Design a protein with these regions (language model features):
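Short, glycine/proline-biased beta-turn/loop segments that scaffold the active-site neighborhood
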Residues: 1-3
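Mid-domain, small-residue-enriched loop/turn segments at the edges of structured enzyme/sensor domains
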Residues: 5-9, 14, 20-124
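Flexible, active-site-adjacent loop/turn segments at secondary-structure boundaries
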Residues: 6, 16, 51, 145, ...
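Charged/polar, solvent-exposed surface patches and flexible loops
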Residues: 12, 16, 31, 41, ...
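Structured C-terminal helix/loop/strand segments within mature extracytoplasmic catalytic/sensor domains
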Residues: 97, 101-220
Length: 220
C-alpha cells in the first residue's frame, strides 16, 4: 500500500491485505484495532487455540532474514531485497532456522482449521463482515496453483496463502488455508503448511494441489 498514498479507507486496506496479501495494509489494520495483543485476545475469547499473533509483519520479516529492525529506506520490495542481499548467506540461513523454531506468530493446522470453522459458522464477526471477508478470500488470485488447482470444477475456494523467501534454497513457510465449497454446496475447511522445504515453488504447489485432490476424494 505505502508509499504511493498516505490515506486509505478501511475497506481498501482490507482488499489489499486479504486479496493481495499486502503486509503493510495488514499491519495498519492491526494497529488500528489495538495491535497483536488485541487480535490474540479476540481469538482467545472465541476459544481459538494454537494460533498466535505476536508481532507486526514489519517486525517479523527482517528477523526472518537476519536483518536489523525495519527502516523507511527499505520501503518497497526492491529496496528490501537489496538490503537483504547485504546479509551474509550463513547469517540468513541461521536466522531462518531460528524463525522456523520460534513459536511466535505461528499456527498448527489444527488451530487454523478451528479458526476457519469459526469463520464459516459466523462466530467471529457480524454476518456482513463475515460475508465481506469470505468474498475477498474468494477473489484472491494468489496461490491459484496450490490447493485451488486440486479442486474440482464448480468448487469455490475462500482462502489465503503465506510464503516466505528462501535462503540457499531453504524455504521457511509455504502455506495455503481456506474453505472450499463443492458444487453441491457442501463446505470444508482445509489447511496446508509446509516448512523447511528445499523443493522448488512449482514442486511445493503441485504437492498442495495433490493434497486438495486427496481431501476431495476423502469427503466423497
Amino acid at each position: 500500500a505505502w508509499p504511493a498514498r498516505i490515506s486509505y479507507t478501511v475497506d481498501e486496506l482490507l482488499v489489499a491485505a486479504v486479496r493481495d496479501s499486502d503486509n503493510t495494509a495488514a499491519d495498519v489494520l492491526m494497529k488500528r484495532i489495538g495491535g497483536p495483543g488485541a487480535v490474540t485476545a479476540c481469538l482467545e475469547g472465541q476459544q481459538v487455540t494454537e494460533v498466535r499473533i505476536d508481532r507486526y509483519e514489519r517486525e517479523v520479516q527482517p528477523e526472518v532474514y537476519g536483518m536489523a529492525s525495519f527502516r523507511a529506506a527499505w520501503k518497497g520490495s526492491a529496496a528490501f531485497d537489496a538490503a537483504m542481499a547485504t546479509v551474509p548467506l550463513a547469517t540468513r540461513q541461521a536466522a531462518m532456522r531460528t524463525y522456523m523454531a520460534d513459536p511466535r506468530d505461528s499456527s498448527t493446522p489444527r488451530g487454523m482449521l478451528g479458526l476457519l470453522r469459526h469463520l464459516d459458522e459466523g462466530d467471529l464477526m457480524t454476518p456482513a463482515s463475515t460475508r465481506r471477508l469470505l468474498t475477498l478470500m474468494i477473489a484472491t488470485t494468489l496461490g491459484a496453483d496450490r490447493l485451488k488447482a486440486g479442486l474440482p470444477k464448480g468448487a469455490s475456494f475462500a482462502h489465503t496463502t503465506g510464503t516466505s523467501g528462501a535462503a540457499a534454497g531453504l524455504n521457511a513457510a509455504f502455506n495455503d488455508v481456506g474453505i472450499f465449497t463443492l458444487a453441491d454446496k457442501r463446505s470444508y475447511a482445509i489447511a496446508a503448511f509446509l516448512t523447511g522445504s528445499t523443493a522448488t515453488d512449482a514442486q511445493r504447489a503441485a504437492l498442495f494441489a495433490d493434497l486438495a485432490r486427496t481431501a476431495v476424494r476423502a469427503v466423497g
